[in-house]
């Protein structure tokens, strides 16, 4: 899955998104020896849906900052009982928001994939 980028807010990132999409379309889906079946464009707000734990209080007004904060907190909760190496890397990272984004997006897209297979 690839995080969908807003075209008007950041056209450079939208271009990079489409380059990545094209690469995986050409090298992945059309290649006979590839295991890639589909390429999903995921809206950035959907990654927070991967978390189904207890509510985390947050009174941050700015939507962007609130989403970053909640993404980090959700990721911390979700990995708490998981891989110790990943937990340490996450705690030490200066880019927790990016790691949390990638993790939550992966969980969300995996959930979608499982739901599609179960239909």
Feature roles, as predicted:
Residues 1-119:
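Phosphate- and other anionic-substrate recognition elements at nucleic-acid/protein interfaces
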């Amino acid at each position: 899955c690839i995080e969908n980028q807003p075209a008007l807010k950041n056209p450079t990132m939208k271009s990079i998104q489409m380059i990545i999409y094209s690469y995986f379309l050409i090298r992945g889906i059309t290649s006979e020896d590839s295991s890639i079946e589909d390429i999903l464009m995921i809206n950035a707000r959907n990654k927070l849906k991967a978390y189904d734990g207890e509510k985390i209080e947050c009174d941050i007004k700015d939507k962007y900052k609130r989403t970053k904060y909640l993404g980090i907190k959700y990721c911390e909760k979700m990995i708490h009982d998981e891989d110790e190496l990943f937990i340490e890397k996450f705690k030490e990272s200066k880019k927790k928001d990016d790691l949390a984004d990638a993790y939550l997006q992966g969980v969300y897209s995996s959930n979608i994939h499982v739901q599609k297979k179960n239909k």
